[in-house]
Design a protein with these regions (language model features):
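Flexible, glycine/proline-enriched loop segments at strand-loop-helix junctions
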Residues: 30, 78, 120-127, 135-140, ...
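Short glycine-rich, Thr/Ser-proximal phosphate-binding strand/loop in the N-terminal lobe
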Residues: 3-41, 45, 121
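Conserved phosphate-binding catalytic cores of ATP/NTP-utilizing and phosphoryl-transfer enzymes
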Residues: 70-104, 109-119
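Phosphate/pyrophosphate-binding loops at sites that engage ATP/ADP/AMP, CoA/4′-phosphopantetheine
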Residues: 43-58, 200, 209
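Active-site rim beta-loop-alpha module in soluble metabolic enzymes
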Residues: 139-207
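Short glycine-aspartate micro-motif
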Residues: 2-8, 59-61, 101-105, 126
């Protein structure tokens, strides 16, 4: 059995792995604005960095929103497509060995997939908040989408200056909610908030939806 390459062409990143009889090999993430550029760049870098010959590859499987743009061979290799939600469900089942679970896939946005009995897989919903939200707000409010820079700024910020917390509206904890839990994201933000405080609020959005 040769290697099967799996590629998830997402909205902001492309993820790629190889699978052979020994298991999963060399996961890689490549970022690019254009999904086609990201796909071909990720695949070329993957096989080069890992010393993989095209002759070693039996199949290339594509998924993700960006894979819809691909309807031709990849470096001469035929490609097959699979549903992203099915891939998420099967992958989580394989990795966890659980028969019944809810899979939360946090990418550019966030989706929820239900797995029943290890084989019945269905998409049950999602929210339009994810990594793309963090990047977009950072571009608008901080004039950068460099996540490392945003995190450094957030470490110096004070979230209490940005988010309305339970303690701001109630003097006792609510069941399951500590006083420092966020009641309203950016609910206390003022026009003179520091950039560091704003960064803390943006990062908190991601944390609040984990």
């Amino acid at each position: 059995m040769g290697m099967v390459i799996g590629i998830d062409v997402g909205g902001s990143t492309t993820k790629i792995i190889g699978v052979d009889k020994e298991g999963i090999k060399h996961p890689m993430i490549v970022k690019a604005e254009d999904p086609i550029t990201s796909l071909f760049g990720a695949f070329g870098k993957y096989i080069y960095d890992n010393g993989i010959s095209l002759n070693d590859i039996d199949k290339v499987m594509l998924t993700g929103v960006g894979s819809a743009y691909v309807n031709q061979p990849l470096y001469g290799l035929s490609t097959d497509h699979t549903d992203e939600f099915l891939a998420n469900g099967l992958g989580a089942h394989y990795d966890s060995q659980l028969q019944d679970l809810i899979v939360v896939s946090m990418g550019t946005g966030t989706s929820f997939v239900k797995v029943e009995g290890g084989k019945n897989i269905s998409h049950i919903g999602g929210i339009g908040i994810g990594g793309g939200t963090i990047q977009g707000l950072s571009r608008l409010l901080l004039k950068t989408q460099n996540i490392h820079q945003v995190v450094k700024m957030a470490e110096k910020g004070v979230i209490e200056n940005i988010d309305l917390q339970i303690k701001d509206i109630c003097n006792t904890p609510l069941p399951g909610l500590p006083l420092d839990a966020t009641a309203s994201t950016f609910g206390k933000a003022s026009s003179n908030a520091s950039m560091e405080d704003v960064a803390a609020g943006i990062i908190q959005i991601g944390r609040a939806h984990v």
